[in-house]
Amino acid sequence: MRIVFMGTPGFAEVILRALVENKNNHIEVVGLFTQMDKPFGRKKELKAPETKTYILENHLNIPIFQPQSLKEPEVQILKDLKPDFIVVVAYGKILPKEVLTIAPCINAHASLLPKYRGASPIHEMILNDDRIYGISTMLMDLELDSGDILESASFLREDYLDLDALSLKLAHMGADLLFSTLKNFSSITRKPQDHMQATFCKKITKADGLVGFKDAKSLFLKSLAFKSWPEIFLENSLKLLEVGLVENEKSHKEGEILEIDEKGVLVGCLKGSVRVAWLQAVGKKPLKAKDYLNGRRLKIGGILA
């Protein structure tokens, strides 16, 4: 079984790795299509996608393609690879009709479709405090995440997971699901999506990390969803790191400092309170919350803003 893999970030790399390192000799990854290297950090040095890095670091004999668009000559390149399936995981591009007709294009999407179509389904699961997390495989069509569902897998949340932990868990689940979908493709009954039930999620931006001390539960969930990027920060750009939800009922002044100890600072919200372990000012290293407050001469009863 010849597979062309299309994917870019770490989530896709976990699934690509599983396909490449599988012990089933019937699966062969014959090509990687991924996004172009992009400037990263203050020095704007080019950074390769995680999927590309995995192939290069492991000296794998898998050709890598990073086209700006999926037109000619890329369509012919795809045809020449003679894939039995094209597997798409967080690629970042919509596939044109010319690609969709080369081979069945199977997308692993990190939600229980038709819920959370779009770029940030895992963020949305966390932000909406979902109790059930899941992933779907679907047969791609010309619209965004609207194709027939092939299979899905899910689990009941037992504890809160941040973006990194949930992404990793769903990626491993997605790899297992893809193996099943590829193996049983010819016998799977496709399930058309109920488009009336579809919900959509947008691309995350830096501005999404801006928070205030209004609702403790919402602030806590944002800290989980935006842990890797953009993190969460106040209007003065002070980052709140390692945030825990203490309670979500009592009413306090926004940003009121309720307690200070070695575990961090307990901060009141209009609804509830959170404990913040570390604080980081712009251009500075993270500090224990207690040390940061001492440096700013902020005490119990003061306002963190």
Curated annotation (Swiss-Prot):
Similarity comment text for this entry: Belongs to the Fmt family.
Gene3D superfamilies linked: 3.40.50.12230
EC number: 2.1.2.9
GO CC, any one term: cytosol
Upper classification of the organism: Bacteria, Pseudomonadati, Campylobacterota, Epsilonproteobacteria, Campylobacterales
Stated role: Attaches a formyl group to the free amino group of methionyl-tRNA(fMet). The formyl group appears to play a dual role in the initiator identity of N-formylmethionyl-tRNA by promoting its recognition by IF2 and preventing the misappropriation of this tRNA by the elongation apparatus.
Annotated binding of (6S)-5,6,7,8-tetrahydrofolate, by residue: 111-114
Species of the source: Helicobacter pylori (strain HPAG1)
GO function term, MF aspect, one: methionyl-tRNA formyltransferase activity
Protein's recorded name: Methionyl-tRNA formyltransferase
Gene for this chain: fmt
Catalysed reactions listed for this entry: L-methionyl-tRNA(fMet) + (6R)-10-formyltetrahydrofolate = N-formyl-L-methionyl-tRNA(fMet) + (6S)-5,6,7,8-tetrahydrofolate + H(+)
Keywords: Protein biosynthesis, Transferase
Domain of life: Bacteria
